[in-house]
Amino acid sequence: MSTMFLRTLREDPADADVVSDKLLQRACYLRKAAPGIWTWLPLGLNVLNKIENIIREEMASIDAQEVHFSGLLPREPYEATHRWEEYGDNIFRLKDRHEADYLLAPTHEEMFTLLVKDLYSSYKDLPVTLYQIQTKYRDEFRPRAGLIRGREFIMKDAYSFTLDKEGLVKAYMDERGAYERIFNRLDLKYVPVHAMAGPMGGFESEEFLAPMEIGEDTFAQSPSGKAWNVEALTTPEPEAIDFTATPAAEKRPTPDAATIDKMVEFANANHPRSDGRDWQASDILKNVVIAVMHPQDEDHDEPWRELVVVGVPGDRTVDMKRLEAQFTPAEIEEATDEDLKKHPELVKGYIGPMALGPQARDGKKAENASETGDALRYLIDAHVARGSAWFTGADEQDVDYYDLVYGRDFEADGTVEAVQVRHGDMSPDGSGPLSFERGVEIGQVFQLGLKYSNALGLKVLDQNGKTVPVWMGSYGIGVSRVMACIAETHHDEKGLAWPAVIAPAQVHVVATGKDAAAFEAAEQLIGELEAKGIEVIFDDRKKVSPGVKFKDAELIGVPIIAVAGRDTVNNGTIEVRDRNGENAEAVPVADAAQAIADRVAALLK
């Protein structure tokens, strides 16, 4: 270590917000160049390379072949798939000196597709799976959590190309199995969850989430063991309610009752329920106006904005992230007061379904409705049962409906998953109530289907001489994020505690004291260990106290620590212990290398 490019820190960096970020910087694995941008130091590169090599071994086991693309890509392929617009502000765009547009690659679907199109033209060429391990770039609005959410990150992305859907499913399952082996070898706990495809497109996707509280993703698990990202969670269709005995809908004044709480208070004070119970927030249908920002498409030369109204039970909170996933590739935000002013039918605090959607288009449009175009789309949350009666807005100031029945008095243009899921909600598979955890996405697999093949013209001749599009799959692992997640789950109060398979070395040898014999014994031990193929870090610093050396060894996180010091000189022994301080023993110098080799072998099993 006297010549190693290394300076450990005693204090956490002021801007580090998660344990992995604090420890990786303190132990000199990384240094921050700018928010979300990192300089990799020798220890960090060592660990990163070992993770990458495990990935390469498992990719080779399924006959995937490695390639490498540029990180600087032309605009045109991304325009052909509409992702130049769909990514919005999330990508880095630039122009060259000739004013041609480029981007820093967020992913490489288009380039892989064009490469295969350029080289392959027959069914005899398929199937093939290609992959790369490369730096990607995304213009994160707020980089956080160190390597977990950065503006640049290292990713393994693989793409399978097959003649038909059956081939795609096989390639998908091969990659999925390889991912499980990779994460198992890395000793990283993971949960495969059903997921939304998002801007990637396709029709089947799973995420691999590492469960941890700092995760940005929430996933739900059913008693049967199945799991879903909450964005992909579907609500079991509620049983329809018989409304034959429900009174006709009635408009009633509800002055100064523009919020859920005030509606409940007013109704309980002025309109007691016939069943004797109090009005509750769950009796109210609240109607939320959102603005949907659609990207440019075949029908629109420019990105365009649409107002949509979503009806949800009054006791539930709208989950904007979950709702947005169903409008992909569009983005959504809450509508502004300026948006509402353009639509007189949207009376703030009293918005209801009768001036919206199918009922407005069927000639029942409220007298004060906008004349600027078709009625706004009206969507209903999946928790709303047909036949259910609601206390909701009447599209007039200080007026609400009572007993407005979904399916009798109003319809919707569609059903959406709009609200936050919560403990006690039923699982989609019907096995019981859901439970929830947070996690960090470490990998995702997609069955892309024909999206990119059709957009970019990737076709081959099949066995009958017919030109057919190629079926594609996409498979990603966040390599640098995986490293952070391992650090996040493998540490204690003293520092990092790497799994032996990716630690920067298997053994950290510390020489202490001023007696040259201790340093000579340490050097002899290191020579014997290296002859056995064991990687070693040697702390040979002469002017550093034993206490500092031990603290650095525990901070750096190599799994086995061997100490040559006073006991070596006096008793002819080397102290060998695990990184966590357990299983300490004094081993004769002559036997130390073999004793350590046995420990290493046990750790690498």
Swiss-Prot record:
InterPro entries: aa-tRNA-synt_IIb, aa-tRNA-synth_II, aa-tRNA-synth_II/BPL/LPL, Anticodon-bd, Anticodon-bd_dom_sf, Pro-tRNA-ligase_IIa, Pro-tRNA-synth_IIa_bac-type, Pro-tRNA-Synthase_IIa_type1
The EC number(s) this enzyme carries: 6.1.1.15
Keywords, sorted A to Z: Aminoacyl-tRNA synthetase, ATP-binding, Cytoplasm, Ligase, Nucleotide-binding, Protein biosynthesis
GO cellular component terms attached to this protein's record: cytosol
Enzyme class, first EC level, given as a word: ligase
Keyword presence, Nucleotide-binding: yes
Top-level taxonomic group: Bacteria
Major location category of this protein: cytoplasm
Residue runs in coiled coils: none
Reactions catalysed: tRNA(Pro) + L-proline + ATP = L-prolyl-tRNA(Pro) + AMP + diphosphate
Protein location: Cytoplasm
GO BP terms, alphabetized: prolyl-tRNA aminoacylation
HAMAP family: Pro_tRNA_synth_type1
The family this protein is said to belong to: Belongs to the class-II aminoacyl-tRNA synthetase family. ProS type 1 subfamily.
Domain comment as written in the entry: Consists of three domains: the N-terminal catalytic domain, the editing domain and the C-terminal anticodon-binding domain.
Subunit details: Homodimer.
Function according to Swiss-Prot or TrEMBL: Catalyzes the attachment of proline to tRNA(Pro) in a two-step reaction: proline is first activated by ATP to form Pro-AMP and then transferred to the acceptor end of tRNA(Pro). As ProRS can inadvertently accommodate and process non-cognate amino acids such as alanine and cysteine, to avoid such errors it has two additional distinct editing activities against alanine. One activity is designated as 'pretransfer' editing and involves the tRNA(Pro)-independent hydrolysis of activated Ala-AMP.
Protein known as: Proline--tRNA ligase
